[in-house]
């Protein structure tokens, strides 16, 4: 049986990792050891931030809804409660988009929700 040396596989693995580090500054894009560490940190950050992005956008939507709700004489908390009682099923993303792009429609939704609470 022929002896198998691992040079080709090592070269392939190193090239693959250096390709991932392309665009990094200095040794991070040229030296395998430094590039490996940089890529591992980058992948860890990307994984974490894909989850964080969802939280960040939800917070942004809530802030926008709260600001628009206060212009209509209520708060975010009261508005969400009123929407639930009025059985108006609209998610925070759409509500925030309405608040920014179509304030009149947002105001009508707020009025409908408040009417359902008082009735």
From Swiss-Prot:
**What PANTHER family does its record include?**
39S RIBOSOMAL PROTEIN L20
Q: Which domain of life is it from?
A: Bacteria
Asked whether the UniProt record includes Ribosomal protein among its keywords, one would answer: yes
Q: Report if keyword RNA-binding is assigned.
A: yes
Gene behind the chain: rplT
* Function statement: Binds directly to 23S ribosomal RNA and is necessary for the in vitro assembly process of the 50S ribosomal subunit. It is not involved in the protein synthesizing functions of that subunit.
Cellular component terms per the entry's GO annotation: ribonucleoprotein complex; ribosome
List the SUPFAM superfamilies hit by this protein, alphabetically.
Answer: Ribosomal protein L20 (SSF74731)
Protein's recorded name: Large ribosomal subunit protein bL20
Q: Which organism is it from?
A: Chloroflexus aggregans (strain MD-66 / DSM 9485)
Q: Which Pfam families match?
A: Ribosomal_L20 (PF00453)
In alphabetical order, the GO MF annotations are:
rRNA binding; structural constituent of ribosome
Key words of the record: Ribonucleoprotein, Ribosomal protein, RNA-binding, rRNA-binding
């Amino acid at each position: 049986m022929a002896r198998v040396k691992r040079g080709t596989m090592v070269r392939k693995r190193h090239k693959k990792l250096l390709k991932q580090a392309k665009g990094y500054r200095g040794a991070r894009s040229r030296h395998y050891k430094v590039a490996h560490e940089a890529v591992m940190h980058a992948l860890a950050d990307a994984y974490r931030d894909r989850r964080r992005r969802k939280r960040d956008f939800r917070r942004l939507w809530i802030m926008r809804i709260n600001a628009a709700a206060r212009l209509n004489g209520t708060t975010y908390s009261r508005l969400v409660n009123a929407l639930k009682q009025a059985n108006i099923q609209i998610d925070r993303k759409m509500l925030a988009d309405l608040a920014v792009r179509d304030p009149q429609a947002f105001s009508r939704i707020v009025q409908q929700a408040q009417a359902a609470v008082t009735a």
